[in-house]
């Protein structure tokens, strides 16, 4: 780890995770959700391939915060019965965790000498760390949402990393004798055909399967995935890397040329591609590489 909030990956990327609270697709108004979507999309459109965003939607046990009524009384009996019913229902809170990654796009030219190499390494890290914190600050203050930075010291960040294997989001302390990767990957996983078996690291042995979404609908809307019934046993993951606006037009021209040479392009498709390139250059449309997976636990 670089500090209490920022982690350096094996490929020298820097990442920081935020828990987003206060808004969801079920209880929030359509106008509020649409405004948040537009603001977030505008931020993504101003960035390029140096940044990647991961959004995880998962569940954790809800904390009711109800003070118990002690003693033998009618109110106490009702309170005990109500508490037992809440425990039976196993209430869950929906959690959104946004991870911002400042990637190392080009290989870093490091001198051979130790002091010079350390200086170049330190300057590059400081520059990318400043850019990462700047984007995180915009997310925290410019979108009108409540966020909480996940930290190693309180166990929230390590617990989040570990939950991606187990599906159980809970705080996990940092071990002073292990690498962060070892703390995050403490579960024992056996891979089988079409799924995995989690033998250790979770409260009970579990099975999991990862579904990769490769065909997209013609239109989407905020909250459309909230209809998944088994919410507490699923993790929905989005990964998005923006593409620089200046390269869109060149990519469109190259794609059209390839389709023309293969005689596999219609006039309407060609027109749509050039229209999209014009919108990208004018700032009305953004492009990026998106991946989506759904992990189901049982």
Task: Write out the residue ranges for each language-model feature.
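Extended, folded cores of ATP/NTP-driven motor/assembly subunits in large transport
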Residues: 1-298
């Amino acid at each position: 780890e670089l500090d209490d909030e920022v982690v350096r990956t094996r490929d020298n990327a820097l990442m920081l995770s935020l828990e987003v609270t206060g808004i969801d697709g079920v209880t929030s108004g359509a106008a509020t959700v649409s405004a948040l979507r537009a603001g977030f999309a505008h931020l993504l459109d101003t960035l390029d391939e140096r940044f990647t965003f991961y959004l995880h939607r998962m569940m954790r046990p809800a904390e009711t915060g109800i003070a118990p009524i002690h003693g033998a009384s009618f109110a106490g009996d009702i309170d005990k019965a109500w508490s037992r019913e809440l425990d039976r229902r196993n209430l869950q809170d929906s959690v959104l965790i946004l991870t911002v990654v400042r990637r190392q796009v080009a290989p870093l030219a490091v001198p051979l000498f130790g002091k010079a190499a350390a200086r170049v390494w330190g300057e590059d890290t400081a520059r990318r760390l400043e850019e990462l914190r700047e984007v995180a600050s915009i997310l925290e203050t410019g979108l009108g949402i409540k966020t909480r930075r996940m930290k190693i010291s309180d166990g929230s960040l390590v617990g989040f990393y570990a939950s991606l294997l187990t599906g159980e989001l809970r705080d996990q302390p940092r071990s002073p004798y292990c690498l962060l990767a070892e703390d995050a990957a403490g579960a024992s996983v056996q891979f089988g055909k079409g799924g995995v078996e989690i033998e250790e690291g979770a409260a009970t042995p579990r099975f999991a399967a990862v579904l990769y979404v490769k065909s997209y609908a013609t239109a989407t809307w905020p909250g459309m995935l909230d209809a998944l019934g088994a919410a507490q046993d699923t993790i929905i993951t989005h990964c998005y890397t923006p593409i620089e606006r200046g390269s869109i037009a060149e990519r469109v021209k190259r794609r059209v040329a390839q389709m023309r040479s293969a005689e596999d392009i219609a006039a309407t498709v060609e027109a749509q591609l050039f229209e999209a390139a014009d919108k990208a250059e004018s700032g009305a449309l953004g492009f990026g590489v998106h991946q989506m997976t759904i992990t189901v636990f049982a």
